[in-house]
């Protein structure tokens, strides 16, 4: 007997990625990617999006469930995008209704992309994880989600868990301290102040890849910079852990390559801020889905 398959769609500001996902194994087939901007410039984003969905459903006639991750805020009912900064044309559009009318007999599930990626870790992670966890994505910004009893925590009106906007050091929110752009600004500042030996460039062109590579080779300055990042992240995590009473944290996203170098500072900082109750059972882990997190996360919405 063939296993159930879902269509997962990860809508990003740069590309829209979609593929057929085996619900049992997480294997992705019929992968397709299209640049978001050309659909936007056509003036008919939702129509072009629907055309791509039609091709997938035509080629996979047994697929009756479609999960869609969007980079922004949704209404409480998960049917209408409210604020999608990368694709403002769909703000306020009854997206689920439009797609359901075009594809009768097919169910559509809409969710914030970070929430979807978080849920995907429960269903498709390499190692089985607890039903309750905080999920943090480190990349251009700092995103996140909370999964409670295998369900996405959406808060009162549907858009809870914006960890990047937690107050942090220097009068800034967290993602204005450790988002990619700000991280590199910090690295170049620390390099300009540093008088020791380091392989990091003094020309103001440090990259995240170079910063990780230098740390891997034991570069003292690179390790110090990642330590500072880990401290700031952990200060935010301490609040989330206490507010939600969740002791498992998964860290993913493009900058999660730094995981091994921020982890000691995370543990040390959490040890300072958390009382024994919250330390008991505390686990900080690396998310495992990598580049497939968005697509697998979108497909995981179909389990709900």
Question: What do these predicted ranges mean?
Answer:
Residues 128-181:
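Glycine-rich phosphate-binding loop of actin/hexokinase-like ATP-binding domains
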Residues 14-15, 116, 140-143:
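Conserved A3 ("GATE") glycine/threonine-rich loop of ANL adenylate-forming enzymes
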Residues 86-89, 109-115, 135-138, 285-291:
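Active-site nucleophile and cofactor-binding loops and adjacent substrate-binding regions
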Residues 79-92:
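A charged helix-plus-loop insertion that forms the helical arch/lid used to bind
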């Amino acid at each position: 007997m063939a296993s159930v398959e879902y269509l997962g769609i990860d809508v990003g500001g740069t590309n829209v990625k979609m593929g057929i996902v085996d619900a049992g194994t997480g294997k992705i087939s019929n992968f397709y990617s299209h640049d978001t901007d050309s659909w936007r410039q056509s003036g008919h984003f939702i129509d072009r999006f629907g055309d791509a969905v039609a091709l997938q459903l035509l080629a996979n006639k047994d697929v009756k469930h479609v999960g869609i991750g969007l980079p922004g805020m949704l209404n409480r009912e998960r049917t209408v995008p409210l604020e999608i900064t990368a694709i403002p044309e769909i703000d306020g559009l009854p997206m689920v209704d439009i797609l359901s009318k075009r594809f009768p007999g097919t169910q559509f599930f809409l969710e914030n992309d970070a929430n979807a990626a978080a849920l995907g870790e429960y269903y498709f992670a390499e190692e089985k994880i607890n039903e309750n966890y905080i999920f943090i994505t480190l990349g251009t910004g700092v995103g996140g989600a909370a999964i409670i009893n295998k369900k996405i925590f959406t808060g009162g009106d549907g858009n809870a868990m914006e960890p990047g906007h937690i107050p942090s050091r220097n009068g800034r929110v967290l993602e204005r301290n450790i988002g990619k752009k700000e991280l590199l600004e910090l690295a170049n500042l620390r390099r300009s102040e540093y008088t020791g030996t380091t392989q990091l460039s003094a020309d103001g062109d440090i990259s995240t890849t170079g910063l990780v590579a230098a740390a891997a080779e034991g570069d003292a300055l690179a390790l110090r910079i990642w330590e500072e990042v880990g401290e700031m992240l952990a200060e935010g995590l301490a609040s989330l852990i206490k507010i939600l009473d969740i002791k498992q944290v998964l860290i993913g996203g493009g900058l999660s390559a730094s995981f091994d170098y921020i982890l000691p500072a995370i543990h040390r900082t959490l040890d300072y801020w958390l009382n024994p109750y919250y330390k008991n059972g505390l686990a900080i882990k690396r998310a495992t889905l990598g580049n497939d997190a968005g697509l697998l996360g979108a497909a995981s919405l179909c389990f709900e």
